[in-house]
Amino acid sequence: MEPAFWHKRWADNQIGFHQLQVNPYLQAHWPALGLAPGARVLVPLCGKSLDMLWLAAQGYRVLGVELSRRAVEDFFTEHGLPAQVTQHGAFEAWRSDEVEIWCGDVFALRAEDLADCAGVYDRAALIALPPEMRERYMALLGAKLPTACRGVLVTLDYDQALIDGPPFSVPDAEVRAGFSGWQVDEVEGLEILEDSPKFIKAGVSSLVERAYRLTR
């Protein structure tokens, strides 16, 4: 999946993946991670997610990473947050008191960039990637994040043969294999097919949204 795909989605405002409220799995399961106030939290492929504001409001330092400059601009503009923009290696870094977002390719992240990240939150990153990129992405998190990192991951599971992603189906077995160096605990699972007309039209019979706690 090429960067041009996502740039076009943002340019055309085809951003059905953007949620207009804070994610309930984040609110329900993040506190149990027990991260210290002031801890830095990585939010990969963050878009302009409201979840970053929620994390900041809980006292965390948020580091989002996003390919689309349009998404980054929209985040700071829509919330009236003044941002200082500088260059940080391969990334254009946008900083405010509440949230920092690096505009660029998530695969360009280095271990030193994430050395002080104690948490990771993924609601729409893993499921945005096709299989070969998911494998690279999970390996990246395992290799670049500190060993004591903890996080929350949200996925979808459905019959991929019936409809193309994104969002892609990421079965439980793939999550556990990709995060083999982590303790993976499913903390919630919900059948959401009745709220997903696109999937019903495609003949999908089950669409399960899962939330996982990741620790190591």
From Swiss-Prot:
Enzyme class: transferase
Cell compartment(s), UniProt: Cytoplasm
Residues involved in S-adenosyl-L-methionine binding: 10, 45, 66, 123
Gene3D superfamilies with a match to the protein in the record: Vaccinia Virus protein VP39
Molecular function as annotated in GO: thiopurine S-methyltransferase activity
Catalytic activity: S-adenosyl-L-methionine + a thiopurine = S-adenosyl-L-homocysteine + a thiopurine S-methylether
The protein, known as: Thiopurine S-methyltransferase
Protein's gene: tpm
